[in-house]
């Protein structure tokens, strides 16, 4: 079964090579009960580690069932430990966070057993070892003898064809020690190959064969009894399946969650950077979307799909006063274009509003029967202007809410006569309050442009023309057509245009750019949080080196260790991300209830992206600690306290 040929093992300490095993030749048959005895430093523990595939020889050949495993790779050795060996340690090496049955069932996870099969088998073994009342007991509530019996049960979980016992009674009192040796003797008679490493001759006396080692050499090999028992029962090999892989992944998830729970405060502090980062990003996006929607809504209220024409070369043109102003004929011509729904000339005049011995300065905006609709204003009370008002220059006026509040706070203004620059006007309508972010608090009234021309200013020129395009018309194409028509009519381009769609697109682009910029700044906090996760995971790997060694000893492969720590990092970030989303919603609720003129708008996409980003951070920043954990040498990890 086991054959060692000229096995040597050297260690380099301080640049000096020290040979611990000096050419060991040994053969152990199936079903033997062997004791390897020797003083401290004799090399017996090193020999046991090589026999159990926890360590590799410097040179020589190790044959297991006629298979040369001395050159096996790390995961191949893990597979051998999983299927062939069971380890019983002096200090038990139970996981303190797992109860008794979970400690025993642990090797079954890496063997691909289903959860039900693992637990049932673990309980069966514990019952045979007299621990039927301790299934759910934590290791720190067990006596030394009970803990060692749990360790034996764990070694038998995957069959334990070869049991390697390192000073199995070293930490026990004499009666518990005898009980453990009786169990090992019984297992030998069941056909298990037992290899005990000890310095105690009384313990070695239980074995049928005693091998003494000194200074790295075997100095004696004596047999008391040549009887060999055949293994009566062994587990069938479990073939990997999709369900087994899924169950193993789930168990890694559960173990990772348990590790996080066991250090609640540290885990929360680790998540804090992720929480703040995710909440910041989501809030920034929600604020950007809310403010963008508010501004675009304001633009819509001002009139969508509109084009306005002004005289001059642009706003602030010092020579615009010399430019021949736009005319009513220009407005009428543009109103007849196929793609124009309607057109209205516009004029603005400042003056004094007077009613019942009260006077306030205000603005008079003049236009056609379409001007209020084009501007996105709606009548709250009364009526809009009619064609008759325009044709006959009626002295009718429509007031806004500020004018009503100033003169008619508790009175219905419809039908009342108000003066503008001493000219009487009858109030026929009241517009709804303009809630846009562009509205001011000035008193504003509206009149037919013909009335303003004929009864107030006498000026035939207009300051702008506003066009409402038909639905489905491309605003940019329409704008170019309007420019060409006016250039031909006026002989030159002494005017400029303002396209509401262009303004909308510019604002959207600006808001998106600002949102990206601020989100980029918020992402920095996510990166800082990710680095924090990596630091804590590196500390966790260092603190749990012993646990990693135990898992590797019972058969965990590098990928199993890496998966567990990677899942742990992803979980930390995902939980932190979820809390961050909750925090963002709480902030949004408070803002929307007590905030200003606009609401924070959360999008489903931003939430999924936030969760995805937090998980990605877990993968990226958890990779290095997980890789470090997976690269640990089993024996080095086991020996670290």
UniProtKB/Swiss-Prot annotation:
GO cellular component terms listed in the entry, alphabetical order: plasma membrane
GO molecular function, one term: ATP binding
One of the GO biological process terms: response to antibiotic
Domain of life: Bacteria
Keywords associated with the record: Antibiotic resistance, ATP-binding, Cell inner membrane, Cell membrane, Membrane, Nucleotide-binding, Translocase, Transmembrane, Transmembrane helix, Transport
SMART domains: AAA
Amino acids binding ATP: 38-45
Spans traversing the lipid bilayer: 268-288, 516-536, 565-585, 601-621
Location of the protein in the cell: Cell inner membrane
Top enzyme class: translocase
Subunit architecture: Homodimer.
Name of the featured protein: Macrolide export ATP-binding/permease protein MacB
């Amino acid at each position: 079964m086991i054959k060692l040929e000229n096995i040597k093992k050297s260690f380099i300490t301080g640049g000096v090579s020290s040979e611990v095993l000096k050419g060991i030749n040994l053969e152990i048959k199936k079903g033997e009960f062997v004791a390897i005895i020797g003083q401290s430093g004799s090399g017996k523990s090193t020999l046991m580690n090589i026999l159990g595939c926890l360590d590799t020889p410097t040179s020589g050949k190790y044959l297991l069932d006629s298979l040369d495993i001395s050159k096996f790779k790390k995961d191949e050795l893990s597979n051998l430990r999983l299927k062939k060996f069971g380890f019983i340690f002096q200090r038990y090496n139970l996981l303190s966070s797992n109860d008794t049955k979970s400690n025993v069932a642990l090797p079954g996870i890496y063997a691909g057993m289903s959860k039900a099969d693992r637990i049932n088998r673990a309980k069966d073994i514990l019952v045979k070892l007299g621990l039927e009342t301790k299934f759910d007991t934590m290791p720190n509530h067990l006596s030394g003898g009970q803990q060692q019996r749990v360790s034996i049960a764990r070694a038998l979980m995957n069959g334990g064809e070869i049991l390697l016992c390192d000073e199995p009674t070293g930490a026990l009192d004499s009666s518990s020690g005898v009980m453990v040796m009786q169990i090992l003797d019984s297992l030998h008679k069941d056909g298990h190959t037992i290899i005990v490493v000890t310095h105690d001759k009384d313990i070695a006396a239980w074995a049928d064969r005693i091998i003494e080692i000194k200074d790295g050499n075997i100095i004696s090999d004596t047999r008391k009894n040549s009887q060999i028992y055949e293994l009566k029962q062994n587990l069938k090999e479990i073939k990997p399946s999709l369900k087994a892989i899924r169950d193993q992944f789930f168990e890694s998830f559960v173990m990772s969650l348990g590790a996080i729970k066991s250090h609640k405060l540290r885990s929360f502090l680790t998540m804090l950077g992720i929480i703040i980062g995710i909440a910041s990003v989501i809030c920034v996006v929600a604020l950007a979307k809310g403010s963008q929607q508010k501004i675009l809504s304001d633009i819509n209220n001002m009139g969508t799909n509109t084009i306005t024409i002004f005289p001059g070369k642009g706003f602030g043109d010092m020579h615009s006063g010399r430019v021949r102003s736009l005319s009513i004929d220009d407005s009428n011509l543009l109103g007849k274009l196929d793609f124009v729904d309607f057109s209205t000339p516009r004029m603005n005049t400042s003056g004094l509003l007077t009613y019942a011995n009260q006077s306030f300065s205000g603005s008079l905006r003049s236009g056609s029967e379409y001007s209020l609709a084009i501007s996105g204003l709606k009548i709250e009370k009364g009526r809009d202007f009619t064609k008759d008002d325009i044709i006959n220059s009626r002295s009718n006026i429509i007031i806004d809410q500020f004018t009503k509040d100033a003169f008619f706070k508790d009175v219905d203004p419809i039908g009342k006569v108000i003066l503008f620059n001493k000219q009487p006007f009858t109030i026929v309508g009241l517009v709804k309050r303009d809630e846009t972010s562009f509205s001011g608090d000035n008193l504003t009234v509206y009149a037919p442009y013909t009335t303003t021309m004929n009864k107030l200013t006498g000026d035939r020129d207009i300051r702008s023309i506003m066009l409402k395009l038909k639905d489905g018309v491309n605003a940019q194409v329409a704008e170019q057509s309007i420019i060409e028509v006016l250039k031909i009519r006026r002989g030159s381009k002494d005017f400029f245009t303002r396209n509401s769609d262009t303004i909308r697109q510019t604002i959207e682009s600006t808001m998106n750019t600002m949102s990206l910029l601020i989100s980029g700044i918020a992402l920095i906090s996510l990166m800082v949080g990710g680095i924090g996760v990596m630091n804590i995971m590196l500390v966790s790997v260092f603190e749990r080196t012993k646990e990693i060694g135990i898992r590797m000893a019972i058969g965990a492969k590098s990928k199993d260790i890496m998966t567990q720590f990677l899942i742990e990092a992803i979980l930390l970030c995902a939980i932190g991300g979820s809390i961050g989303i909750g925090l963002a919603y709480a902030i949004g609720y408070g803002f929307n209830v007590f905030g200003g003129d606009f609401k924070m708008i959360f999008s489903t996409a931003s939430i999924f992206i936030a969760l995805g980003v937090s998980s990605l951070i877990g993968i990226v920043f958890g990779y290095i600690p997980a890789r470090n954990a997976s690269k640990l040498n089993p024996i080095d990890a086991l020996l670290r306290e």
